[in-house]
Amino acid sequence: MKRRTDLDTKSSRKVYKKYEYTEIGSIEEENEASINFYAVVIDACFPYKVDEKKYMCYLKVIDTTHNVKEGDDNFAIVALQSRKFEDLPIIQRCGDIIRVHRAEYNYKDDQHYFKLNMSYSSSWALFSADEEVAPEVIKDEGDDFTYRSYAYSGKQYNFDTQDQKLLKNTRAWNKSYFAKNDVIIDEMYTPLSQARQEEGDFNVVGKVTQIVHRDYYTSDLRVKDTSKATWFLTVSRRKFPRLYEGVIIKIRSVNIDSETERERCLELAPHSNIMTFVPFSRLAKSLDSQISLSPDKVDKELIKKVILTEPVLATTTFGDYSELPLTELSEIFEDVTDKDAVFRARFSILKITPDRVEDYVEEYTPKGAPRSKPVYKVQFLIKDPSTALNDNLYKIYLYSHGDLGKEFFPGVDPSSAQTPSGHSKLRKYASTLMKFNVHIDAVLEKVGGAFFIRDTEMKF
């Protein structure tokens, strides 16, 4: 996908085919010919990998003849398929315009479907909803994006006087339509107060009331909607670079994070997307006035538990390996050999096993020893910014059978961990490790293909 073009379409010497464009509402159900059309995007998933040879992206689009009204969700579905991720559009603003060439058409169950196979002859181009440059593009001095695509498939795109007229008319209608209608109606998303009732993924429309950038790769969001419920979300800054406090967003396909002990946390799937709204959106303006940035009384206790402040390091390293440079998890776990090595990494803990702190310790009998001794045997599932774009969780161990790692929980060695006082301290430590903004700086030793924490201690 070409994200930024310097193509001067007026000076291009190539003679382009003149296309005939069709309005969605006027297409006959039995149509078998390929379709060209302009439409407004009201929903889009993030391009995602289906298998080794296929990437997909799904859009919901409308035009002057086929659009959403209150209680009547008329939209068309566009399915784009490609062998390469970069051939698919990344659309992160509800209300921007897409031009489609050579789409296959199908009408089923009162629904218009369009399919674009990017490996063959289909193509697309994205245009800003207004005459100003889209937020996706860094505009250089002198650039005029009135009639320029900010992203398109292939190496170049054609654009003639017919396209100028169609784009101008689509923009005019789009501005009026978004200003007079919510477009994203109630049936299209779930209030956050009802999120726990959802069994699968669902959509959310709300305001980002706080955002903390952990590092160059990851941000933590606090999201609130008109139901006055607040939920928390960790996102990739690479995938969603235009989020800020106060912005109204539409989250496509989110789930409740069931793998964390944190309360009210959402998680994204590879196809999940976060879209902002065009500036003339009636819905966005209405939500902005209704949703305050400050927390409501019912959420203050929650926010105390899930502290969304500047990221903090909960651990410190010591010993010979404490000065090692940081290595990303993607690099550490990429090595599938059994060669032993030592690394220093920084990451977040998403799950601790066993679930009960009373089970963190087990008896271990060293070879040749007359009796057993208590040791820590704890498993952590972790991620870091380098792994934010995949679904993988990485497994490491706190296993003190060789005396490495026994200092991890300060003031609680494996022997004292088996007392009521030790259990109480371990619960506090575990709660801290699972907090929203806590990072772990640890030395990891690879032994026989597994990774063990050593020379690392919590700073409490």
Curated annotation (Swiss-Prot):
InterPro entries: NA-bd_OB-fold (IPR012340), POT1 (IPR028389), TEBP-like_OB2 (IPR053979), Telomer_end-bd_POT1/Cdc13 (IPR011564), Telomere-bd_alpha (IPR003415). One of its GO terms (cellular component) is nuclear telomere cap complex. GO terms for biological process: regulation of telomere maintenance via telomerase; telomere capping. SUPFAM superfamilies: Nucleic acid-binding proteins (SSF50249). Its main location: nucleus. CDD domains: hPOT1_OB1_like. GO terms for molecular function: G-rich strand telomeric DNA binding; telomerase inhibitor activity. Pfam families: POT1, TEBP_OB2-like. Belongs to the telombin family. This is Telomere-binding protein homolog. It comes from Euplotes crassus. The lineage of its organism: Eukaryota, Sar, Alveolata, Ciliophora, Intramacronucleata.
